[in-house]
Amino acid sequence: MKIINYQFPKSSFLSVEKDLEIITNAMLKNQRFKKLLHYNSEDALDKPDLTQKESLELFKKNIKIVPKLYIDHSVLSYIIISFDNFTPNAENPEFRDNIISFDIICHFDQWQLKDFQLRPYRLAAEIDTMFENKHLTGIGTLQFLGAN
């Protein structure tokens, strides 16, 4: 039976799930990024690479796509990925521009790394390196807008 007047949903909001997949896959391929999240010590970057199982556990514990943290007895570093400020694209109104936010949350006791490095800024540097001027599912590239 043919359904008359059915249109496949055309919403740029549907690209969020694909963008999340691209972002989290890139994060799970970056060993420096994973070490900074997994190991709480000052020498986190000198530690062994994570196994596939440890990497996948980061997505459950440290990398969040829902902005909710659970309070438990372990002290972890977190990355919360969120999408906000959707506006019509000036050049192509079928697309929406939006802001992708990466909230970096680290316990103060875990900020200090070796050689005057600070964990939140090293995580920010890795995120910047992975995604600056990269293309996701939309028509443009990611551009750094700022940090708080």
Residue ranges: model-predicted function:
Residues 7-8, 111-119:
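Short, flexible/disordered intra-domain loops and linkers
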Residues 1-92:
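Small/polar-rich, solvent-exposed N-terminal microdomains that initiate assembly or binding
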Residues 94-110, 127:
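Oligomerization/assembly interface segments of phage tail-like spikes and tubes
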Residues 118-148:
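Acidic-leaning, charged glycine-interspersed low-complexity segments
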Residues 89, 109-112:
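Eukaryotic short linear interaction motifs
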Residues 93-100, 115-123:
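"Short basic amphipathic alpha-helical interaction patches in structured regions
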Residues 86, 107, 132:
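Residue-level marker of positions within ordered structural domains that often coincide
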Residues 93, 106, 114, 139-140:
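Short linear functional motifs in flexible/disordered or boundary regions
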